[in-house]
Amino acid sequence: MNGRRVPYYLAAFASLITFSVYLPALRNDFVTWDDNSYVITNLHIHSLNWAFFRWAFSGFHVGNWHPLTWISHALDYAVWGLNPLGHHLTNILLHAMNTFLVVLLCIKLLEMWKERSMPDAASTFLDRRRILIAAGVTGLLFGLHPLHVESVAWVAERKDLLCGLFFLLSISAYANHIRALVNEPLEKKEAASRFFNRSYLVSLVFFVLALLSKPMAVSLPVVLLLLDWYPFQRIRSWKSFRDSGVEKLPFIVCGLISSTLTIMAQRTVGATGMMGFVPLRARMLVAANAFVDYLGKIAVPVGLSSYYPYPKGQEVTLVSPQYLIAVIFVVGLTAILLVAAKKQRVWLSAWGYYVVTLIPVIGIVQVGSQAMADRYMYLPSLGPFLLIGLIAAWVWAKADSLNQGSRTVKAVTIAVAISLVISLSYATLKRIAVWRDDFTLSTDMVRKSPDAAIPHTNLGIAYLKQNRLAEAVHEFHAALKLMPDFAEAHNNLGNAYAKQNHLDEAVHEFLTALKLKSDFAEAHSNLGMAYAKQNRLEEAVHEFIAALKLRPDYAEAHYNLGNAYARQNRLEEAVHEFIASLKLRPDDARAHNDLGAIYMEQNRLEEAVHEFIAALEIKPDDSDAHYNLGAAYLNQNRLEEAIHEFITVLKLKPDDAEARHNLEICYERMKTMK
């Protein structure tokens, strides 16, 4: 076997196993949680045109600025439409690619560690085979650990996978840049040779692409500084540290721009609002606890959840054993590794990578209501995984040094490794099943966090989608007992009441939601719908207009406003709103049908026929559209076509008296014409 190809075979092996284990995710559906706003109802990604690219790059959407992620979702939609299989397939392929890159990057870094270490350094136990062992173990851990399921099985977390891809490629290109330089201390190199090295520029480009995918990549400049310190050993003095920092200036500038845009984007949806209510001291304690908890979940991946609620303020104090132990652990471990770094730097370097890559999402700048999230560990986990890989290689080296029992030790090591792969694969499959759909996901959330409002709200939404209204109401009430000022829960409870035709209660809930969150466009639209059902049309129109002032691209509000205008006999205004709705959502059969009905009233029969046909192209079994099309044909005296449509209506709705009556009229006219 060609020795140069072995790393690629190993990487492909780890990647293929990862891909195979994740295949059951292809059966998963979208989930309402973010998949809705990222893909399902995101009309912008439905067209790959100049308007889409302008949208992707020019503003903040869903509290984020990550244009490359939007482009990725748009490409998926262009190929797969709203078939979740294709979107999940892309995620799985990206994760498998990242696993492939992890193996190759680990081999490259370990080889450079060995090349640049002193003869008596710890890296001397790493020969070619042991480097492959360390990299292979790291890659399998990265690919199969259930902590990463959230990033892969959740379509909306495409940003993790894309960011990870370009993050890894940037480090790999930077390592090539280091290899291209003469193996000398940094202070002896000219700046020009550093900044105009092709690999350096490639690394910078990949970093920018990572930022355009997810701003969590902002930590990369510090990671590169850390690599310069160890294992590249380019930083040997304060001057070389300064020069290394100067070399990273383009990265730092890009990171600062991305960070600024991210904070601005998060503020548009109030995601950073929690900062004002959680004291910095409490956030620091929760962050310290998260550092420890994440390591625990790497070591023993049980109790994983898609939502870890933020602790209540009175629970977060230094006298609490949980937080005191966490602070002692983080500070103590850091101190021990700093002392140990005089002889052995690899542990501090790996710990530093873990801390640095977690800091942007650890909660010091609090975003959202979660204390931690599995998805945040997608890149930081590499540090601990690589250490585990090195331990496996060290055990193999010790086995090689034994005069007797070497085969036994190696056999036990292989057996443990196989058992680990099987166990991780099983745990990953279990987590993939949790992400099957809204119901399985929210049920798991409630089971693991019964005292948090968001899981109950999500379960209520899942019940609402299944039309299990009493159970939905129960869950929304449970959420509001835990968080009475939760506007989203009030809005969803209003939706459940509206479906039960309890309109007064629905109106009350929508009004409560709007008192808590005045810029809640969905609540305005839902309140308008409730008013419309109560025949309070002026109030309904007012609410739909309020929703559209907040969200001009809100297709459903345009549609609802069109219906309200139609009921008020304001036909031209109704036409305007239906057309506006269809520009945003051209595949809405209801809007085509209702627009056609308005055209019928205006005696614009050709336009009416066009709209009814458009509705039926989208929804062929829509009996109302068939009936309306038949009526339009009847008015045009196109009797055979009208007969065909009314017969189709009766096949779909055999007891439709109006269709039967119109069919008889058609037959009578045909007799008269003969």
Which residues does each PLM region occupy?
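Polytopic membrane enzymes that build or remodel cell-surface glycoconjugates and lipids
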Residues: 1-495, 522, 526, 560, ...
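Short coil loop/turn residues that delineate tetratricopeptide repeat
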Residues: 444, 448-451, 485, 519, ...
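Conserved alpha-helical positions within TPR/SEL1-like repeat arrays
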Residues: 454-465, 488-499, 511, 522-533, ...
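Terminal, low-structured helical/coil segments at or just beyond the last alpha-helical repeat
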Residues: 643, 647, 655-674
